[in-house]
Design a protein with these regions (language model features):
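Rieske [2Fe-2S] iron-sulfur-binding domain
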Residues: 26-148
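Zn-dependent metallo-beta-lactamase
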Residues: 1-41
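Residues at structural and domain junctions
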Residues: 10, 104, 152-153
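Hydrophobic ligand-binding cavity/cleft-lining segments
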Residues: 146-170
Length: 170
């Protein structure tokens, strides 16, 4: 396939942005819903709340590529997991397949979906798509300062900028 300059430029932009942290949803909403599908830099991702922790996985089951975000949070051997809606494969917060109901054998370590770094800060779930990134979530010292007024909202919005530019309004 021949890529146009625009497609190439978008892909290069997305690739360059993967090393940064991106705000994706409110922590409060995630704790309530447990599963939130998002698209970040062209990747379909499912944001999860498992074992009291945030997690982000590629939104695709390794079996028949069903969307994990259409599945449900379940328990397997006492641990939270996301279970695929199609054949019930279960994944932990690191993307490792931990249960295949149709077989009683040990599951290969190679059956896993990509996972991404997550962090909760300022009431927001942040995701970084690059595991080798050294970037940090922007410091907002005013967040805990009572002299400032907080306006807590989080609407789904498509942006074509990074979080620092959003914060600064540029």
């Amino acid at each position: 396939m021949i890529k146009t300059n625009t497609v190439y430029q978008i892909e290069k932009f997305y690739e360059g942005m993967k090393k940064y942290w991106h705000p994706v949803c409110s922590f409060k909403k995630l704790k309530y819903k447990k599963i939130i599908p998002i698209q970040l830099l062209g990747e379909q991702i499912v944001i999860l709340f498992l074992q009291g922790e945030t997690a982000a996985l590629l939104d695709v089951c390794k079996h028949y590529q069903a969307q994990l975000s259409l599945g449900k949070i379940d328990k397997f051997k006492g641990n939270d997991c996301i279970r695929c809606p199609y054949h019930g494969w279960a994944y932990d917060r690191f993307g490792k397949c931990i249960d295949i109901p149709q077989i009683n054998k040990k599951i290969s370590k190679n059956i896993k979906v990509p996972s991404y770094q997550t962090c909760e800060k300022y009431g927001i779930v942040w995701v970084c798509l690059d595991h080798n990134s050294k970037s940090e979530i922007p410091d907002l010292p005013e967040y805990d300062d009572g002299n400032y007024r907080k306006i807590n909202f989080f609407e789904k919005e498509t942006t074509k900028t990074n979080v620092l530019r959003m914060i600064m309004g540029t």
